Curated annotation (Swiss-Prot):
Subunit structure as annotated in this protein's UniProt entry: Homodimer.
Single Gene Ontology MF annotation: rRNA (pseudouridine-N3-)-methyltransferase activity
Residue ranges crossing the lipid bilayer per the database entry: none
Name of the featured protein: Ribosomal RNA large subunit methyltransferase H
InterPro entries noted in UniProt: Alpha/beta_knot_MTases (IPR029028), RlmH-like (IPR003742), tRNA_m1G_MTases_N (IPR029026)
UniProt organism field: Shewanella baltica (strain OS155 / ATCC BAA-1091)
Length: 156
């Protein structure tokens, strides 16, 4: 199974890239973690945020291979504990499809992305900077994998 993180934004700070890659390399070959970056629309004083979100959403949806299970990261989503995420990861594996996880930009996800999602995951009730979300999601997925495989990374 492939876990595909589709995120708005390119040119992340070095610590974000290093953090994401640290967890990405820990995954086994049979559960690869891939990152697809979508260029963020130009924002400014007079920017049309609705149009920017729409364009970002179109690009995100175009990056999803047909048949993938889609999970949006969004505040109204489900708050998962680590064991609940591990259970979700097992269900995704048993489903036999690859999984695309969608991370929006500063204003969140486009409505079309939310509508296309099979599931919605609320990472935190806190407002997190979208670059940090990449690292937290990668670590959370790795931790869930470690729970499922009895790897010593996760400790109760």
């Amino acid at each position: 199974m492939k876990l595909q993180l589709i995120a708005v934004g390119t040119r992340m700070p070095d610590w974000v890239t290093r953090g994401f890659e640290e967890y990405q390399r820990r995954f086994p070959r049979d559960m690869a973690l891939e990152l697809i970056e979508i260029p963020a629309g130009k924002r400014g004083k007079n920017a049309d945020i609705v149009r920017i979100l729409q364009k970002e959403g179109e690009q995100m949806l175009a990056a999803i291979p047909k048949g993938n299970h889609i999970v949006s990261l969004d505040l109204p989503g489900k708050n998962w504990t680590t064991p609940e995420l591990a259970t979700a990861l097992t269900k995704w594996q048993l489903d036999g499809r690859d999984v695309s996880l969608l991370i929006g930009g500063p204003e969140g996800l486009a409505p079309a992305c939310k509508e296309a999602a099979n599931q919605s995951w609320c990472l935190s009730a806190l407002t997190l900077p979208h670059p940090l979300v990449r690292v937290v999601v990668a670590e959370s997925l790795y931790r869930a994998w470690s729970v499922n495989t009895n790897h010593p990374y996760h400790r109760e």
